């Protein structure tokens, strides 16, 4: 049997010992229908067959469990209407402490109906092999993002007695599984599929305890069409050529949402001693040149701050533009959208943020979705410590100022009393946790962590605390009180000073008060980069305009950092609508220059164009939307177009480009375009030729097209997908 090994264990590194999950039951999670509090999940095994022609995944799941109390009547798992369960079975665990993972038998392809899901093949044990017996099961509604799967258990089960539950299923139209036809990839050569589990989508990938409070190790065997490369978030992987299947194993406990898979026309290139990039062949040279050597630099900086990297390898896979978020911190294998490759500084920040998640989020995880700031706030703090170590304080302060500007912009939109501005957000039953993802999770969380670092008076001492915190809680899930108790225990002098009760800055108020952060970091070390931005913005808002424009045009922003230009454009966006003569002068001064910059800059300028109904530059908006297939670069423009007087223009561009968009993104844009149909779409001023034939279309015709065959499917709800960057 020929085996091509792709081991993710770092060369010469010893595997960190795996701590068993804590004995107390996991935290209660209202987003989960499961009975996770009654069981301990030890390991899960997946046998998966990818069927891109049918957009179907056929699976066999083997759960290794033990009950925490005697005679549990049933096992309840999170599932989804997209899952069709074929069978459930029970198997007593063998007497041996550790059993070789089971194999899976895959049906041979052929004409006729779709073959059944894979069958498990358990290893023969000495004596009589534990027999499988069928189990009754039922599926009940839970929320609009999932179902509950109840599996009846044998009555004689004892507490702490290991057993296995085997579930065979197929999954179609699953929110977690994104199927792409070849034409939606860069190379247009082979089909592509990826999964996105955060927050609660993986219940449509496989039945599970879909809560961050539960972690376990996993293994998987995956069969894919010939020539398709499969990758998973696993510490070890290998391809068995004779069998035509991929084998994966994750040796550290992870929550269900971090089990991830991607398959397509992917090729690897090493970029460091423990890192490689995977991408479509046409993207691989660019990805390699931008990240070669850099990832190892970031990992080494993180290790100096927070202790050894415990996941073996750190690989990155670049996904097609359909990927619904910017990046996802799947352990050992970060998923990142390929569109970000042209924006160097954003690429650096996004990858470093995912590196930071290796300690904060993946190793130590928030036990409930109500406290996502525990992962995102700490990861953002760690990200900025890493950038300070590698690129200096000025760059870090510039990036922080850019993000805090965005936070205050969101605060104005939501209002200071918005409950989602709390760090500890109360998740009501039925509400999708993905709705809680916002800038407060990241930036208000960061500000609180930064405040804690200032209390101890020395960033290095705070780094030492975080290092000890990770060592204590690695491979477990925690609540905010665990972090704060550990902080006060590590700094007893601060506990004696009752820093948690300082008037106006109480820890409880940080966690539960609405509104902006109670304190923000000192960003004066970045003034050399932020001061020119503020000066240029002030020039463009000064009078008389001709003198201001002349002074502004003397400033060469082509030499600025990307975050400086983005911050300047964001300030202009905040002031929109601007006087038409200002927009005209801005266009004359910057439009051609900005058109040659990366997409993060171009989209901001084009939003200014749209929000100010500046028709002379609409051709640039059209060209941008014709070239983009990414949610991050299309949704904001369509939302702005449909808010103002340019809805007809938006309809026309969408009709011409929809064939190149992923169905999920197409549905999202259709929902934006269909809102308010029936009201006038006539522009506020005389339309240019850019508005074309769409100006003559009737609202009823538009609505018929938007809500006809391409109407949103009940099987895929947009709110099922986390679209936060």
Curated annotation (Swiss-Prot):
Alphabetized InterPro entries for the sequence: Aminopeptidase_N-like_N, Aminopeptidase_N-like_N_sf, ARM-type_fold, LTA4H_cat, M1_LTA-4_hydro/amino_C_sf, M1_LTA4H, Peptidase_M1, Peptidase_M1_C
Gene3D superfamilies, sorted: 3.30.2010.30, Neutral Protease Domain 2 (1.10.390.10), Peptidase M1, leukotriene A4 hydrolase/aminopeptidase C-terminal domain (1.25.40.320), tricorn interacting facor f3 domain (2.60.40.1730)
EC number: 3.4.11.-, 3.4.11.18
Site residues (Transition state stabilizer), renumbered to this chain: 442
Biased composition (Low complexity): 679-690
Active site: 354
Any one GO biological process: proteolysis
Cofactor(s) the protein requires to work: Zn(2+)
Regulation: Inhibited by calcium but not affected by chloride ions. Inhibited by amastatin and to a lower extent by bestatin. Weakly inhibited by puromycin.
UniProt keyword terms in alphabetical order: Aminopeptidase, Hydrolase, Metal-binding, Metalloprotease, Protease, Zinc
GO molecular function, one term: zinc ion binding
Free-text comment on the cofactor: Binds 1 zinc ion per subunit.
Region annotation (Disordered) ranges: 676-699
Record-listed Zn(2+) binding positions: 353, 357, 376
Principal EC category: hydrolase
Catalysed reactions listed for this entry: Release of N-terminal amino acids, preferentially methionine, from peptides and arylamides
Pfam family, one: Peptidase_M1_N
pH curve summary: Optimum pH is 6.6-8.0.
Tissue: Ubiquitously expressed. Expressed at relatively higher levels in heart and skeletal muscle.
Top-level taxonomic group: Eukaryota
Residues given in the record as substrate binding sites: 326-330
Protein family membership: Belongs to the peptidase M1 family.
PANTHER family given in the database record: AMINOPEPTIDASE RNPEPL1, LEUKOTRIENE A-4 HYDROLASE
Known function: Broad specificity aminopeptidase which preferentially hydrolyzes an N-terminal methionine, citrulline or glutamine.
Identification of the protein by name: Aminopeptidase RNPEPL1
Organism in which the protein naturally occurs: Homo sapiens
Native organism taxonomy: Eukaryota, Metazoa, Chordata, Craniata, Vertebrata
Gene: RNPEPL1
